[in-house]
Amino acid sequence: MEQLQFLRLDRARFDALCGLHRAYKEAIGEDAPTQADLDRLLGAMEREKILFYGCVDEGGQLVGCCSVSPTFSTYTYATAGVFEDFYILPAFRHRGIARRLVSFAVEDSGVSSLTVGCADCDVEMYKALGFTVPLGNLLAFEL
């Protein structure tokens, strides 16, 4: 059985995270982040505005990631989180990594609730990962 490590990502693994993040953006048809985007991301990570989590295989390769952005919520009157940036390399899918990564992120971040907004095609996947409480519609304000 392969040995996997689940951890909070920091500056030491930022380059690996950037590579995985580029693959994620390409997979969903979005533009790759610019260097300025990545600089802002690193700053946000260092200030813990966003927490990135990863799964590393026994060879040290980052094979999956997700993020939790903590915020205060009156839904629970405690710290809640917004779940994003979820990506597992295709060769590592269907091995239970996704479930374990989500569980690790929830436990380590200490959030009292975790929400996710997703495309219609991803709803069943997120339900299978434990996102089962419907909260109505999620809309973004156009700026």
Task: Locate the predicted segments by residue.
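Conserved acetyl-CoA binding element of GNAT-fold acetyltransferases
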Residues: A78-P90
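Conserved acetyl-CoA-binding loop-helix of GNAT-fold acetyltransferases
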Residues: I88, H94-E107
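A short helix-loop-beta-strand connector motif used in the catalytic cores of GNAT acetyltransferases and
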Residues: G43-G54, V82
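Conserved beta-strand in the GNAT
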Residues: G54, Q61-P70, Y87
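Hydrophobic alpha-helical core bundles mediating ligand binding, dimerization, or RNAP-core interactions
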Residues: L17-K25, D37-L42
